[in-house]
């Protein structure tokens, strides 16, 4: 399907700025899609203005009430500047370095929860320290663990002990990370005690989880940095790894939360390099953005996806250091 954004008028946009057709079409897709959206435009194509316009329109049209834009740490100020360049009258909240940790972070998250912002721009590293509730984390982890246990059973049934061991090791690592982050969440709850009540007048809850922020739209800039999501599979080839980066598991939890609350179509990833090392990265992008579509097509499991859309080919390659094959 092709999306035509020529109908969009962008009320409130700065006079003298006209978005290109590809930017308008991307915004139209984000606003109309029933799944998450990957904006895989090349470097220099204007993904920042695309993201700003999409979030602002989603807020204006009522598709979202609390859009959040997650960007690399050094780009928060630039994103805020670009947002106000495109929408001079916008009411945005942008995270500074002082807001990134400790009491500064507690105050910032409380402002996010209490304010009516057109958009909130946050630093990547601070975003990944704000988790969904421990109860939800444990529930989501149980789902992923079940997928891995199924793959372990498959591997052991065909005598693939190597793949089975890798999957078991990854489950152990994920359980360790889960236990650590749950304990950290409990400590955070004590540390930010009172911040949310002061701004919300809510005397019942003494901590802030991601769910408390009211976020119902996520725009992830430089999304290729979240490609290392654990893959439950017995396929053992370069580029397909069962290991996961914790920040990727955390983002997946937040995407699952948005889907669970009916906002899965408000997940937007932007990157100029959607594939850098392996085609398996495309599978992970689809898991973040459109897992229901994968299930509907019968390719939710990586093995099914790989057999449907790819093939394993043996070839000779030069070593990265260039000294052999």
Language model features: what each stretch is:
Residues 85, 89-92, 96-98, 142-182, ...:
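Conserved P-loop NTPase motor "coupling/switch" region that bridges the ATPase
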Residues 116, 120, 126-215, 219:
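Coupling/switch/interface segments within P-loop NTPase motor domains and analogous charged loops
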Residues 94-105, 123-129:
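Conserved helicase motor
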Residues 65-66, 116-119, 214-216, 263-268:
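Loop/turn-to-beta-strand initiation segments
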Residues 44, 125-126, 224-231, 274:
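Catalytic acidic motif of RecA-like/P-loop NTPases
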Residues 2-40, 226:
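Conserved pre-motif I regulatory segment
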Residues 102-120:
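Conserved motor-coupling elements within RecA-like helicase/translocase cores
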Residues 38, 42-45, 50-81, 87-91, ...:
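Conserved SF1/SF2 helicase motif Ia
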């Amino acid at each position: 399907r092709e999306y035509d954004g020529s109908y969009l008028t962008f009320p409130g946009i700065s006079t003298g700025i006209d978005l290109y057709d590809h930017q308008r079409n991307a915004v139209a897709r984000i606003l109309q899609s029933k799944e998450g959206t990957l904006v895989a435009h090349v470097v220099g194509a204007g993904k920042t203005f695309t993201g700003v316009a999409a979030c602002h329109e989603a807020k204006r049209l009522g598709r979202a009430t609390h859009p959040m834009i997650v960007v690399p740490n050094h780009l928060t100020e630039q994103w805020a500047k670009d947002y106000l360049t495109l929408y001079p009258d916008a009411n945005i909240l942008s995270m500074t370095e002082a807001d990134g940790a400790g009491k500064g972070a507690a105050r910032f998250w409380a402002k996010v929860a209490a304010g009516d912002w057109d958009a909130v721009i946050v630093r990547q590293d601070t975003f990944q320290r704000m988790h969904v509730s421990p109860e939800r984390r444990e529930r989501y982890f149980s789902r992923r663990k079940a997928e891995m246990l199924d793959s372990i059973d498959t591997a052991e049934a065909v005598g693939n002990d190597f793949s089975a061991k890798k999957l078991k090791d990854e489950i152990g690592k994920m359980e360790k990370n889960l236990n650590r982050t749950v304990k950290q969440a409990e400590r955070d709850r004590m540390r930010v005690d009172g911040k949310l009540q002061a701004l919300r007048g809510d005397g019942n809850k003494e901590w802030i989880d991601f769910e408390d922020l009211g976020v119902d739209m996520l725009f992830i800039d430089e999304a290729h940095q979240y490609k290392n999501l654990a893959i439950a599979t017995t396929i053992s080839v370069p580029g397909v790894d069962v290991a996961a980066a914790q920040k990727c598991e955390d983002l997946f939890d937040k995407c699952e939360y948005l889907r669970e609350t009916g906002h899965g179509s408000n997940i937007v990833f932007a990157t100029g390099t959607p594939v850098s090392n392996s085609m398996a990265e495309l599978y992970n992008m689809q898991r973040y953005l459109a897992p229901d579509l994968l299930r509907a097509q019968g390719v939710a499991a990586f093995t099914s996806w790989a057999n449907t859309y790819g093939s394993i080919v043996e070839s000779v390659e030069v070593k990265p250091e260039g000294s052999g094959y």
